[in-house]
Amino acid sequence: LLATRALTEDELYLNLGYWREANTPEAACRALVCLLGREAGLNPADRVLDVGFGFAEQDRVWLSEFAPREIVGLNITASQVAIARERMCQYGLEGRIDLREGSATAMPFAAETFDKVMALECAFHFDTRADFLHEAFRVLRPGGRIAVADILPEPPAEHRLTRFHQRWT
């Protein structure tokens, strides 16, 4: 758990990070957040949807680095939403980052509502990724962009052994 997350007093990242130049977990996590923001082309005119925001650490970074007009977060885990809202209040960002509880596969938003839809290392939790992408395209404005940093977990070891056995016996 601690090897894959940067949990410090000030930062609650839940991503694996981008380690090209980083030398600490916190720096790597922030680097991945910034990389995704750059690849998405975040800018001050954007209305951004962050799906599966965890503790919304990336939303704070995107707000400070790219200054989008608005960030709305959607997360299915009530305890994470509560903690993230409390943290945004502590940082004075409750009016700038709107965090909501809801599903990535049944988004409570009208069609063509957002300029950018972001998902930072959370899509592997969605049931299913295809349903998430369908919803993401539905809420995306024409000309908008979806930016996803994803993880593809390996199957359990016993599954790999079974496949190996089937292939070679």
Label each residue range with its predicted role.
Residues 152-169:
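Short, glycine-/aromatic-enriched active-site segment of Class I SAM-dependent methyltransferases
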Residues 1-17:
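N-terminal, positively charged/glycine-rich alpha-helical extensions of SAM-dependent methyltransferases
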Residues 116-128:
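A short SAM/SAH-binding and catalytic strip from SAM-dependent methyltransferases
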Residues 105-117:
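A short acidic, Gly/Pro-enriched loop at the edge of an enzyme's catalytic core
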Residues 27-44:
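Conserved alpha-helix/loop element of class I SAM-dependent methyltransferases that forms part
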Residues 49-106:
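Class I SAM-dependent methyltransferase SAM/SAH-binding core
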Residues 148-150:
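Acidic carboxylate diad motif detector
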Residues 130-145:
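A short glycine-rich, Lys/Arg-flanked "PGG" loop and its adjoining helix->strand segment in the class I
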